[in-house]
């Protein structure tokens, strides 16, 4: 059987992984096998952390809305219940932004919903 010279293809594949792992510590950035394993772990962690970030932002928005709504003597859960009952489905992100940045606008909306 004749010898197959892989040429630049294998080198390009390894370099791509090494470039991805260039900021990793120790052998994880130097040795190909360790870098390959670390890249897989990094991508898995990145996926999980994107999901956790969504969860954390939702909790933050709810906390901000709750703090703003309690000023009017209503809890967050009652506020959301009244909001859906009045068929005004604003998402939590916009409500939290209104509560922090546009307080007069949020107060008119909350008074209409609660009343």
From Swiss-Prot:
<keyword id="KW-0689">Ribosomal protein</keyword>
<dbReference type="InterPro" id="IPR049946">
    <property type="entry name" value="RIBOSOMAL_L20_CS"/>
</dbReference>
<keyword id="KW-0694">RNA-binding</keyword>
<keyword id="KW-0150">Chloroplast</keyword>
<dbReference type="GO" id="GO:0019843">
    <property type="term" value="F:rRNA binding"/>
</dbReference>
<dbReference type="GO" id="GO:1990904">
    <property type="term" value="C:ribonucleoprotein complex"/>
</dbReference>
<dbReference type="GO" id="GO:0000027">
    <property type="term" value="P:ribosomal large subunit assembly"/>
</dbReference>
<keyword id="KW-0934">Plastid</keyword>
<dbReference type="InterPro" id="IPR035566">
    <property type="entry name" value="Ribosomal_protein_bL20_C"/>
</dbReference>
<keyword id="KW-0687">Ribonucleoprotein</keyword>
<comment type="function">
    <text>Binds directly to 23S ribosomal RNA and is necessary for the in vitro assembly process of the 50S ribosomal subunit. It is not involved in the protein synthesizing functions of that subunit.</text>
</comment>
<dbReference type="GO" id="GO:0005840">
    <property type="term" value="C:ribosome"/>
</dbReference>
<keyword id="KW-0699">rRNA-binding</keyword>
<protein>
    <recommendedName>
        <fullName>Large ribosomal subunit protein bL20c</fullName>
    </recommendedName>
</protein>
<dbReference type="InterPro" id="IPR005813">
    <property type="entry name" value="Ribosomal_bL20"/>
</dbReference>
<comment type="similarity">
    <text>Belongs to the bacterial ribosomal protein bL20 family.</text>
</comment>
<dbReference type="GO" id="GO:0003735">
    <property type="term" value="F:structural constituent of ribosome"/>
</dbReference>
<dbReference type="GO" id="GO:0006412">
    <property type="term" value="P:translation"/>
</dbReference>
<dbReference type="Pfam" id="PF00453">
    <property type="entry name" value="Ribosomal_L20"/>
</dbReference>
<dbReference type="GO" id="GO:0009507">
    <property type="term" value="C:chloroplast"/>
</dbReference>
């Amino acid at each position: 059987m004749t010898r197959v010279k892989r040429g630049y293809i294998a080198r390009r594949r390894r370099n791509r992984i090494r470039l991805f792992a260039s900021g990793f510590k120790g052998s994880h950035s130097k040795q190909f096998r360790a870098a390959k394993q670390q890249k897989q772990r990094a991508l898995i962690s990145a996926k999980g952390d994107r999901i956790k970030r969504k969860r954390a932002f939702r909790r933050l928005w709810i906390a901000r809305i709750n703090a703003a709504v309690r000023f009017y003597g209503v809890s967050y859960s009652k506020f959301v219940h009244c909001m859906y009952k009045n068929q005004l489905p604003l998402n939590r992100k916009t409500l939290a932004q209104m509560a922090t940045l546009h307080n007069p606008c949020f107060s008119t909306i909350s008074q209409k919903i609660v009343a």
